[in-house]
Each structure stands twice: as C-alpha cells, then as structure tokens.
C-alpha cells in the first residue's frame, strides 16, 4: 500500500520529502532501485539504480535540485531533499523502492503532497480620491505571495466586513510564478471613513491588514495577525 503524507515549504527554502522504512532497516545499495517522480505527469525527479551513477534521465527542472543521501539509503531512508522550492513544485511526488533480490518486489511506496507558500508584501493602500462628488475610491496592492490570496475590505470603526460587491480584485501571476493582487474599493462618500485592506494567505493562516482614513495620506501602522476575520464574518461576506 502507498503511504500518503503532506508537507509545506516556503518559496526559496529547502524541504525534505519523507520516504523511509522503519528504524533499524538495512539495505544494500547494489540491491535497491529507488525512483522519485511526480505523481500526475510522471516527471523524473531523481533515482538510484545500482552500478548506474548517471542521472541523465532526471528532468531539467530537478537536476541538481533533488538529492537522496547514500548514507541514508543504507539505513532505509530514501527521503528526497529538494532545494530552492518554487511555486511549480506544488504537486504530489511519488517515492518507489524495489528490491532486486526479492524479484523486484515493492519494498516501499510513499506519495508526498508538497504545499508551497510565500508571504505577501504588506499591503499598500492609496490615499482615497474622488472620481465624483458622492464616491470615494481606495486601491490596495500586495505582491509576491502564494497561493492565491483572499482580499477583504474592513470598516475599521466596528471591524465589520464591507460588501465584496463594492470591490474589484485583479489577481495575476508575475514572472516569478507568484501572485500580485490589486483591489479597488468604491464606496459612497461620508464625512469620515476609516477602512482597512486585508490580504489573507489561507495556507499560512496569516492576514496582513493596513488601514486608511479620509484626510490621511499615511495608512495606519501595518500589522500582521492570525485570522483576525472570524469564520462567521467571512461567511457573511460571501
């Protein structure tokens, strides 16, 4: 049976995808065949074949980025060390270990789901401007995050969520494969408006919130909080 595991890594970091037999195991590197590949596309990540030192069949995206430890393999640890994680690495990886002396019987099969994350920049909220006498427009920008964010606008007076129908979000992938987001909020003009823009990264369970007040060119102090928007409030906004 194939074991299933999950692991999370930040963009640019190194991560270990675990594939190991119970402690105390011993293996002969001339007997075991080890294959790491992506589960869906079957892209070759790395492998170990006895008396075959060349890794010419490794996909170029993983060459020199994916390694197993020979010393670890002797102990039954066939884990994969993946360096410099990218957003494109977010997928399922399959580890398969076979024994030649056992008639190429499967010794170990593990599927590891890698979740990739990157922190969004602290949002920048533009000073409000008035396209008309009875309307105010705010713009909130945040870049270089992963996965795709949720964007909320908040009435800072009572911390209630503004109707999402009032905002227009543009989210796109940049050259690094990370997400940039621009949200434009249009609200009716009132004598005093105190609003905040919240960028939520669900995978990191992190929200970045910046406020803006009418008459102020500088936003309130930036802050990072863990889930300041309650589930009930979110549901009410959708």
Please give the residue ranges for each predicted region.
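N-terminal Sec-dependent signal peptide, specifically the hydrophobic helical h-region
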Residues: 1-13, 235-238
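Type I single-pass or GPI-anchored cell-surface glycoprotein architecture
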Residues: 60-61, 100, 192, 198-206, ...
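Interdomain boundary/hinge segments at the C-termini of tandem beta-sandwich modules
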Residues: 38, 112-118, 212-219
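Ligand-binding face of N-terminal immunoglobulin V-set domains in extracellular IgSF glycoproteins
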Residues: 63-113
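Solvent-exposed loop/turn motifs of extracellular immunoglobulin-like beta-sandwich domains
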Residues: 9-17, 28-31, 73-77, 83-95, ...
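Beta-sandwich strand segments
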Residues: 27-29, 102-109, 207-212
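N-terminal V-set
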Residues: 17, 22-64, 146-167, 196
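Proline-enriched interdomain boundary motifs that mark the N-terminal boundary
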Residues: 1-3, 118-128
């Amino acid at each position: 049976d194939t074991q299933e595991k999950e692991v999370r890594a930040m963009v640019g970091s190194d991560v270990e995808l675990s594939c190991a037999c119970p402690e105390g195991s011993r293996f002969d590197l001339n007997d075991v065949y080890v294959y790491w590949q992506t589960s869906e596309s079957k892209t070759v990540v790395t492998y170990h074949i006895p008396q075959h030192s060349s890794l010419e069949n490794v996909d170029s995206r993983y060459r020199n980025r994916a390694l197993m430890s020979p010393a670890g393999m002797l102990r039954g640890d066939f884990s994969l060390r993946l360096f410099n994680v990218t957003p494109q690495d977010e997928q399922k990886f399959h580890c398969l270990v076979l024994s030649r002396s056992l008639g190429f019987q499967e010794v170990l099969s593990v599927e590891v789901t890698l979740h990739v994350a990157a922190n969004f920049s602290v949002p920048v909220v533009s000073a409000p401007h008035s396209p008309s006498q009875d309307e105010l427009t705010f713009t909130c920008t945040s870049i270089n995050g992963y996965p795709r964010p949720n964007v909320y606008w908040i009435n800072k007076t009572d911390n209630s969520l503004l109707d999402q129908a009032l905002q227009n979000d543009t989210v796109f992938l940049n050259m690094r494969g990370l997400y940039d987001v621009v949200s434009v909020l249009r609200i009716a003009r009132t004598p005093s408006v105190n609003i905040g823009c919240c960028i939520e990264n669900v995978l990191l369970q992190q929200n970045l919130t910046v406020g803006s007040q009418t008459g102020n060119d500088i936003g309130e102090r930036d802050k990072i909080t863990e889930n300041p928007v309650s589930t009930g409030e979110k549901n009410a906004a959708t």
